[in-house]
Amino acid sequence: MSRTPVTVRAAGACDVASLRELWSDILRRGGLDEQLADVGRIVTIAAGRDDQCVVVAEVDGEVAGAVYLEAGTFTPLNLEPAVLAVSPHVFPRFRRKGVGSALMEAACRFAEQHGIAHVQTAAAAESRDANRFMARLSFAPQAMLRAATTSSVRARLPKTRQAATPAASSKQRIDRVLAARRVRRGERVPG
């Protein structure tokens, strides 16, 4: 079985609509115009920086997939250099045609150009095919990234911790100051 040749290149402004469609499930929620503006900004910023790149894979001149690459560190606490390959996505009609491999090859090439020995990526936990693909490429699980809204986390925290918010602490400090003033004036302190 021969594969259709896959070419990779840096994304440009002409790719914004295709990238928005490809990454629609991971972009912030909003209208089409907002998402297009977000992707346009990402592509523009990456094009102007040496440590970032949006790579597009094409099959027969049509965008088949893309990945965002950024040279940085493993984590803010682990300063080992690493390239983060964010959201390597392939359109469903181009899967199993070498597009994903071409994107990850571009990530390795980007890492080598920056003298970086490690590439890291993430796949959605429920995406069995993506996780198997990454495992075949020798990516080992490192962490489980979780996300929640601030309000939902706060609702699940113990109420005793919530009482220590800055507003409550400020009220407690004011009560102490007023009590100290009463003591100095010789007034009786309630309680």
Predicted regions located by residue number:
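Active-site rim helix/loop that mediates acceptor-substrate recognition in acyltransferases
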Residues: 32-54
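Conserved GNAT acetyl-CoA-binding A-motif
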Residues: 111-123
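Conserved beta-strand in the GNAT
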Residues: 56, 62-71, 89
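A short beta-loop-alpha structural element at the N-terminal edge
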Residues: 6-21, 32
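Terminal substrate-recognition subdomain of acyl/acetyltransferases
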Residues: 2-3, 135-191
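Conserved acetyl-CoA-binding loop-helix of GNAT-fold acetyltransferases
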Residues: 90, 96-109, 136
